[in-house]
Amino acid sequence: MAAMQAAIADAGISAADIDYINLHGTGTRDNDISEARAINTLFGRQRPLMSSVKGAFGHSLAAAGAMEAVVSAISISNSLVPANVGCRCPDPDLKLVPVMQPSQGPIETVLSNSFGFGGNNAAIVLGACGKPKPDRTPADTQPMAILGSACVTGTGRTGWTMRAVAKGEACAGLLDLQEISANLSAG
């Protein structure tokens, strides 16, 4: 939830200004529960339209965030919310209702979630060009801001990492721990 809150605050808007959430939505129990809890807490009963494109594309791992940001931008420019492909019956325990068929309508602001292994989570707010929110502006206007921190995980080489993960083995990085965690310091 912290990534979503930070993205919304950095955009100078409120949760009520979000028209569509591009869910991380992997269809895995733990991920979907975590994302649903965060959305339900942040948005309450005023949840915007939402869907995940992973049912259409699959999980593209490291490329997922970039692909979903592009889908979010296309949603804004085409005023279209993509369907949650492959979802036939949403889990009622999640208390979320994804868009089941493509939905046409005005979409000016999108929150796109990307959650990584080990809690490396990101969220980005994308808005329609030339449509600023008149009552709120970011305190520090920047073309882009990266909020939070992350660390390099795995071996640094996708093939090696995936083989180790498939075997249930630990992944040893190519960088030493001090170098990897340098950006995690509080100061």
Label the model's feature ranges.
Residues M1-G187:
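Conserved "HGTGT" condensation-loop signature of ketosynthase/thiolase-family condensing enzymes
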